[in-house]
């Protein structure tokens, strides 16, 4: 039957990509439908119970800066928070949280059920409705047809998913959930380029059977307790719990080696490529044969369960081998396994077949987000979901798509890497992937993206008000520090030495003093009984005041580096955003070699910058393309196209 209501946007899948996509489209005012095979598993954390980490936390902050749900849901469900790399520079500091699975799922579902313009429907999708080269809706497993102007596919690991435990396997999207076999077959019928990837998960352990007394306790950060959302507060966090650390040993490694003849990975049963940066324990033992032990983190799954996630022993070995290897680990000699570990193989679709908006190049109105694009991780999925949801909304409203730049957001780095380079293994975000990471910090994600989000219609009034207060306070206080001067008479040696290590010998601005590595803003403001502090607090809200202080300090201390990076960006921007005509035949570009023209015709890059990052496309080829565009009067910049861009960097 044809469902009586037509929607603007349909989102298929209710994981981390799907929920952010649906919420974003609905915030833009689009009539949105989220189709999921099970409403009870919306926002499910299918693997480890954690959010964030190096590179990943940056993505979560960016999603939050644009009104997304992941950071706020983590603040409401996080049972341990830590700042990683806290002793290093601000570019690589990252927030990580352990989350209570049940509370996280509840927080996401509450947002979905209370979001205007968004409806939920429980049915697996078996087919896409396509007319010509345009998607017009989706068909469920019982034949209900939903029509829409745009469809966002966020199928995760469900497309023709196959679960492996030892040499036994069965179809499934994850343990306990069916695979999307019919939808996978339909996508293959559409001739979209695809491949096979693999991921895995460890056995879960009953905490009552673990001896924590022989393990190392790993508490979270308590002074202060971090928050994920720019609008978050520590009071939102539930009870905080520690994690625990133990290690594998030589006996563990011998047990694993003895079971490799029944491993689906090492007997050729699994064809998909697994994630390089989250390898299985059998992969670790094989690849790092001389390493005597591997660290294992015992992570609590929640406040109302005894279940623990042993991070570090993901495996698809037979259950008897899993049991033996777990019992060989210190503190887990008597451990009871609640759920066996497994590997899952699934279909993904080559992201080089997508535009920078995440819309398919082959089928108009069809967007892809999450693991279906070859990525791994909740955070990468959520970021893509946000972008796909926004651009589905732009497509419906006939507005230019928003395509974040590499110098603007980790989301821009992520998508650009996917659509220009493709994937041969599950893609994970790291800070090292970003050329401009000093400008792409966690702390300034709102300064980079909230204004863009407001223009696009995904940032609400409360967030916009807090952002403006923060931006104005940072600007005002930075100017005050630059224009307030002190000299040796005003700052005698007995006051200067404890802070600076020596007396001042000439006049300095407060900004000059703060620029010194050893000087902190709070210490400078407390100098001489607070004589140099602002007349009024930075903000009445303590968490916002702390964010303002952090922005001021980083902006002043790293001003020279940030300015140099901004100059590099300006130099690259002219050619980076030059648009390439859709119908350009690269074989007609004079001087372009056959291999290069073939690759460009195959990948159809949207901009000169994207073209430059395709393997085999040389700087000389880019120069020839530029000459061709100028001769023909073709090509236009992002600014000329009218797409929202936002600020690449505020005063940090």
Swiss-Prot record:
Its main location: cytoplasm. Coiled coil: none annotated. GO terms for cellular component: cytosol. GO terms for biological process: tRNA methylation; tRNA wobble uridine modification. Its cofactor is FAD. The keyword tRNA processing applies. NAD-binding protein involved in the addition of a carboxymethylaminomethyl (cmnm) group at the wobble position (U34) of certain tRNAs, forming tRNA-cmnm(5)s(2)U34. It is found in: Cytoplasm. Keywords: Cytoplasm, FAD, Flavoprotein, NAD, tRNA processing. The keyword Acyltransferase does not apply. Transmembrane segments: none annotated. It holds the Pfam family GIDA. Belongs to the MnmG family. It comes from the Bacteria. Homodimer. Heterotetramer of two MnmE and two MnmG subunits. NAD(+) binds at residues 274-288. SMART domains: GIDA_assoc_3 (SM01228). PROSITE patterns: GIDA_1 (PS01280), GIDA_2 (PS01281). It comes from Cupriavidus necator (strain ATCC 17699 / DSM 428 / KCTC 22496 / NCIMB 10442 / H16 / Stanier 337). FAD binds at residues 13-18. This is tRNA uridine 5-carboxymethylaminomethyl modification enzyme MnmG. PANTHER family: GLUCOSE INHIBITED DIVISION PROTEIN A, PROTEIN MTO1 HOMOLOG, MITOCHONDRIAL. Signal peptide: none annotated.
């Amino acid at each position: 039957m044809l469902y009586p209501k037509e929607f603007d946007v349909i989102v298929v899948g209710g994981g981390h990509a799907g929920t952010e996509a649906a919420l974003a489209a609905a915030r833009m005012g689009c009539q949105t439908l989220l189709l999921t095979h099970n409403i009870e598993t919306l926002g499910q954390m299918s693997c480890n119970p954690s959010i964030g980490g190096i590179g990943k936390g940056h993505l979560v902050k960016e999603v939050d800066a644009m009104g997304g749900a992941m950071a706020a849901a983590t603040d409401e469900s996080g049972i341990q928070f830590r700042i990683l790399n806290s002793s290093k520079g601000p570019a690589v500091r990252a927030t990580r949280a352990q989350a209570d699975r049940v509370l996280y799922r509840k927080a996401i579902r509450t947002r979905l059920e209370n979001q205007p313009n968004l409806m939920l429907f429980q049915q697996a999708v078996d087919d896409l409705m396509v007319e010509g080269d345009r998607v017009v809706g989706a068909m469920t497993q019982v034949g209900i047809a939903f029509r829409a102007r745009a469809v966002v596919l966020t199928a995760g690991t469900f497309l023709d998913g196959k679960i492996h435990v030892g040499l036994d396997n069965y179809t499934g999207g994850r343990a306990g959930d069916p695979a999307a076999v019919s939808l996978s077959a339909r996508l293959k019928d559409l001739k979209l380029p695809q491949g096979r990837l693999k991921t895995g998960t460890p056995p879960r352990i009953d905490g009552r059977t673990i001896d924590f007394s022989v393990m190392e306790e790993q508490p979270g950060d308590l002074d202060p307790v971090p928050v994920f959302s720019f609008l978050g507060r520590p009071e939102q966090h539930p009870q905080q719990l520690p994690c625990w650390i133990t290690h594998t040993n030589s006996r563990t490694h011998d047990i694993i080696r003895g079971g490799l003849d029944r491993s689906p990975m090492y007997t050729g049963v699994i064809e998909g490529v697994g994630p390089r940066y989250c390898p299985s324990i059998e992969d670790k033992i094989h690849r790092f044969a001389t390493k005597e032990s591997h660290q294992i983190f015992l992570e609590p799954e929640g406040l109302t369960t005894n279940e623990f996630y042993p991070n570090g022993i993901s495996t698809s070995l037979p259950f008897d081998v899993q049991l033996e290897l777990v019992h060989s680990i210190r503190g887990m000699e008597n451990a009871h396994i609640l759920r066996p570990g497994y590997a899952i193989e699934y279909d993904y679709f080559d992201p080089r077949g997508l535009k920078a908006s995440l819309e398919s190049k082959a089928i108009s109105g069809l967007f892809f987000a999450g693991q279906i694009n070859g990525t791994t991780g909740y955070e990468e999925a959520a970021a893509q979901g946000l972008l796909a949801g926004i651009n589905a909304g732009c497509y419906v409203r006939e507005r230019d798509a928003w395509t974040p730049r590499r110098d603007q957001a980790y989301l821009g780095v992520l998508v650009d890497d996917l659509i220009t380079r493709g994937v041969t293994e599950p893609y994970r975000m790291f800070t090292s992937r970003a050329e401009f990471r000093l400008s792409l910090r966690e702390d300034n994600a709102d300064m980079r993206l909230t204004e863009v989000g407001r223009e696009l219609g995904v940032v609400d009034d409360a967030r916009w008000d807090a952002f403006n207060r923060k931006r104005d306070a940072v600007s005002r206080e930075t100017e005050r520090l630059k224009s307030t001067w002190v000299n040796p008479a005003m700052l005698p040696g007995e006051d200067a030495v404890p802070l600076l290590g020596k007396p001042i010998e000439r006049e300095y601005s407060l900004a000059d003093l703060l620029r010194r590595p050893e000087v902190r803003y709070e210490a400078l403001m407390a100098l001489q009984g607070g004589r140099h502090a602002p007349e009024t607090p930075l903000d009445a809200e303590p968490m916002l005041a702390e964010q303002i202080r952090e922005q001021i300090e980083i902006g002043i201390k790293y001003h020279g580096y940030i300015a140099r990076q901004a100059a590099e960006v300006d130099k690259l921007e002219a050619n980076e955003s030059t648009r390439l005509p859709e119908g350009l035949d690269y074989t007609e570009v004079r001087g372009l070699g056959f291999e290069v023209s073939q690759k460009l015709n195959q990948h159809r890059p949207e901009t000169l910058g994207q073209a430059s990052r395709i393997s085999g496309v040389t700087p000389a080829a880019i120069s020839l393309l530029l000459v061709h565009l100028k001769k023909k009067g073709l090509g236009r910049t992002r600014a000329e196209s009218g797409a929202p861009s936002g600020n690449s960097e505020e005063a940090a």
